[in-house]
Design a protein with these regions (language model features):
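Terminal low-complexity, poorly structured segments
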Residues: 1-2, 96, 123
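Intrinsic-disorder/low-complexity loop/linker signature
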Residues: 46-49, 60-61, 102-104, 115-119, ...
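C-terminal, structured domain-capping segment
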Residues: 72-101, 129-168
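Strand-loop-strand motifs at the edges of beta-sheets in extracellular beta-sandwich domains
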Residues: 111-114, 119-121, 125, 133-138
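Surface-exposed interaction patch
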Residues: 8-12, 16-21, 34-39, 66-115
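Beta-strand-rich interaction surfaces with strong enrichment in secreted/lumenal proteins
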Residues: 66-70, 121-127
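Short, polar/proline-rich extracytoplasmic segments that appear immediately after membrane translocation
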Residues: 1-63, 153-157, 166-168
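Intrinsically disordered, low-complexity, compositionally biased regions/tails
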Residues: 29, 52, 64, 79, ...
Length: 168
């Protein structure tokens, strides 16, 4: 009986000395959108080049620019700029340097993609929500090549450039 009274007393004492803490609240997730795209394509330099398709943003695909030019002789240059626009609400940044691809034939041809001031596009370059940066694309038939380096037939070059963006 004493043991039973002792257990009941300890149980009541424990119950009297215990409590439950609760945390209650609400959180609202605001609407956000991701919208990094191209806008405002402008040809800036055409020297000795024939433009068969001016650079344009692909309809329905604002993350792609296409163009078609013929560089007619050594020293020919074609250059255009395009804005990279962050029309979303989330800050973005480049995740890597641009990847240039295609059969660029570097002995006779230069293909560069830089910021409009000529500085290289590097990883971790920020693009704030609502901001834009201008990219310059330049293709050039080198003028300081030898006769042996000249192509013996028209050569189509398929050029690509990818600039990866991620959330900052």
């Amino acid at each position: 009986v004493i043991a039973l009274l002792l257990i009941v007393t300890i149980s009541i004492g424990y119950a009297a000395l215990s409590t439950t803490l609760n945390i209650n609240g609400t959180s609202t997730i605001k609407t956000q959108n991701w919208d990094v795209h191209f806008a405002n394509v402008k040809a800036t330099t055409t020297t000795g080049a024939t433009v068969t398709k001016a650079p344009t943003i692909t309809e329905g695909k604002t993350t792609e620019v296409t163009y078609n030019v013929a560089l007619n002789q050594p020293g020919s240059v074609y250059e255009f700029t395009v804005d990279v626009v962050n029309g979303g609400t989330i800050a973005a940044k480049t995740s890597a340097i641009p990847t240039l691809g295609g059969n660029t034939q570097p002995t006779i041809f230069n293909y560069t993609v830089t910021w409009s001031d000529g500085s290289p596009i590097t990883a971790n370059t920020a693009l704030a929500a609502g901001d834009k940066k201008t990219v310059k694309v330049r293709i050039e038939y080198k003028k300081d090549i030898t006769a042996a380096q000249l192509p013996s037939a028209d050569t189509a070059l398929s050029l690509t450039c990818s600039i990866p963006y991620v959330q900052a």
